[in-house]
Amino acid sequence: MDYKKLFHKEEAFQRETFQKRMEEFGFKNMARMELFLWDLELFLHIQKILGDKIILKGGAATQFYLPRDAQRTSVDIDMLFFGTEEEIKETLRKIEEYLGTEDELFYFHKHSPKNPKTNLPLHTYYMKVPSVLSNAERNMDRESIPYQELKIEFILQPEKWEYERRTGENIFAVNSSWNYQILPLNYLFADKLTTLGCNTIGVQNERLDEQVKQFYDIMMLSRNCISEMQCSVVKEKYLKRAEQEWNTRKITLGSTLERRDYEPKYIVEDVEKQLLRYQQADSGEDAELKKFINDFHSLYLNRKVQYDPKRLPAEHHWFA
């Protein structure tokens, strides 16, 4: 591995550095920290080629707005892209040519789901990246080449989006002066809100692990960034995204949405039911949800953070 080809310094990828930062910031899972650093590294390579056509969103972007003691790890790269699939392929080809090795590291593999949940113009890839961790730490059987796998998603957009440039100087996984193009806070929060409503537009119950992550991001953005948000902008962006997602699900899922035209009140009712479930997470009657919450704590969070999903309905009134 030629670390001189990377944006982040070689020291950032060393095991000793991960251990030091884990101890400093209270994280428990070194594998997730390593993956998050590779997320940021790969995004910079993509950004260098695609310029202002690419924007980081999702969990990775969220961490740039949160203080270190509220940040979590993220294992995926979710991006908005104003361009074509051919441009994506050419970008990935250039990265493979620049970083690719003989042991299959830094090569992209297209993923095509058998039963997609939406018809979004989404292009998903997986890539193996080098790892300094043991097989046990990566939860893998013996491998001749230590690696981890990144998930990279491009969501094609019909027009360019606004974005903010933020450095990684306050990110738990690395001290980086590089600028990352990320979704503006109001847009990001509105996008996060559309993950609520498991039977309408949100993350479905089949993905409870993803639901718990989204609840966390919404709670922490509300707790730490609410004074920086413009409620009118959040509402405008949310309603636009919600309708898009409604119409997408209506086509692909064949659910009860088929018999209803888009109406925000249906989503609100759905969200209220979902919030009630999380409010009762410690009742002892929902072992499945409680397990996913506990798993999220151990895999993604630092020891210092206080995260109790059942407090979400009581703490926030933004959905009322």
Mark where each language-model region is.
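Glycine-rich beta-strand-to-loop/alpha-helix junction loops that act as flexible
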Residues: L56-A61
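Structured mid-to-C-terminal alpha-helical surface segments
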Residues: M1-I54, L66-R72, I77, F81-A320
